[in-house]
Amino acid sequence: MSRIGKRPITVPAKVQVTIDGTKVVVKGPKGELSRELPVNVSVSQEGETLQVTRRDETRTSRQLHGLSRTLVANMVEGVSQGFQRRLEIQGVGYRAQVQGRNLILNMGYSHQVQIEPPDGIQFAVENNTNVIVSGYDKEIVGNTAAKIRAVRPPEPYKGKGIRYAGEVVRRKAGKTGKGGKK
């Protein structure tokens, strides 16, 4: 039995779960998410808990059991509390700002980079160098944060660029010259 898959999911009071065959719909104060689960797993609701079970013991079912449980748990957590991803901008002259709903990045290019948020995603900027991506769908929050980071990933020599909060960038030593010009 999958150690992750057999753990029950606690549903908060303000969250409503509807199960229709393989489709799971979760509604909460932050929004509504729905997902079609594989036919190898089934979800049952007992009071304030959800239980994900697999139909048989095939290898595919065992693989999808823990995944499906985690996906449903992320849906429940997303509509009740939401998710956020923090990014840090390092480098002279590199900064971010929010204009309307869009994120404007000045990253040393000849133009500003404008990022439009998908539905359900909000941007916030602190001190022009910290970007917060928040929303109720964990997958979309992570993908949006990855797109922002891809605008200027941290480089290994000076560490300039956009990185996730707490990300450690491996640094490289620069060239060791022979002495320089005289």
UniProtKB/Swiss-Prot annotation:
The keyword Hydrolase does not apply. InterPro entries: Ribosomal_uL6-like, Ribosomal_uL6-like_a/b-dom_sf, Ribosomal_uL6_a/b-dom, Ribosomal_uL6_bac-type, Ribosomal_uL6_CS. GO terms for cellular component: cytosolic large ribosomal subunit. Pfam families: Ribosomal_L6. Gene3D superfamilies: Ribosomal protein L6, alpha-beta domain. Keywords: Ribonucleoprotein, Ribosomal protein, RNA-binding, rRNA-binding. Part of the 50S ribosomal subunit. HAMAP family: Ribosomal_uL6_B. Belongs to the universal ribosomal protein uL6 family. This protein binds to the 23S rRNA, and is important in its secondary structure. It is located near the subunit interface in the base of the L7/L12 stalk, and near the tRNA binding site of the peptidyltransferase center. This is Large ribosomal subunit protein uL6. The gene is rplF.
